[in-house]
């Protein structure tokens, strides 16, 4: 097992949470981190999830308690050990005020970055891993600016699409609007950043 393994388990696309046979006496509705069943959370670099259950799993060590999460974008399921919540970077959705700040950030002038695509890719990859929307926005702005000057490499194009998806999906949920509408708002802000 690699030394950075965080205990997160990806489950088959159609795996039902009932398949884990969580013992009733160990099933919870709120964890010590305050996340509740039914709450929407962000799993860094993957997107918005919903907590389906909090409890043990027979496929891991007894005594470990997990968040049983369902990805909203594709309905795949994950289990994250509660003890690894900080390491994984699991967080609550941003609030309206933070989303307004995000749009202001998207509209600011783009900061200079590596001219070498490999250095730029490494730098952007580290930002994506944080799970903070501000860092994901910096990646999106950076790659958007580069794409206006030249074609993105295959890896950078995938990263651009991932960054856009992560921002669009969270903004849409927080603002209560359809994703295409959120995407238009983000595109407008990105255009403003290029106009400086």
Language-model features, listed with the residues they occupy:
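Short, positively charged and aromatic/hydrophobic N-terminal segments
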Residues: 5-24
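A positional/architectural concept
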Residues: 22-88
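Charge/polar-rich, low-complexity and marginally structured segments
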Residues: 88-196
């Amino acid at each position: 097992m690699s030394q950075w393994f965080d205990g997160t388990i990806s489950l088959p696309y159609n795996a039902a949470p009932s398949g884990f046979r969580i013992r009733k006496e160990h099933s919870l509705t709120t964890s010590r981190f305050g996340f509740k069943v039914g709450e929407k959370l962000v799993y860094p670099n993957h997107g918005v999830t919903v907590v389906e259950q909090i409890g043990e799993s027979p496929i891991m060590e007894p005594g470990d308690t997990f968040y049983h999460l369902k990805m909203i974008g594709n309905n795949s399921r994950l289990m994250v050990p509660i003890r690894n919540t900080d390491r994984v970077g699991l967080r609550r959705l941003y609030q309206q005020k933070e989303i307004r700040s995000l749009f202001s950030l998207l509209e600011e002038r783009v900061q200079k970055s590596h001219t070498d695509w490999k250095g730029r890719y490494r730098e952007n990859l580290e930002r994506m891993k944080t799970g903070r929307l501000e860092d994901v926005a910096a990646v999106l702005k950076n790659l958007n600016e580069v794409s206006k000057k030249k074609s993105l490499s295959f890896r950078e194009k995938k990263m651009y699409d991932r960054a856009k998806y992560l921002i669009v999906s969270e903004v849409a949920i927080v603002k209560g609007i359809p994703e295409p509408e959120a995407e238009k708002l983000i595109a407008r802000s990105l255009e403003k950043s290029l106009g400086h």
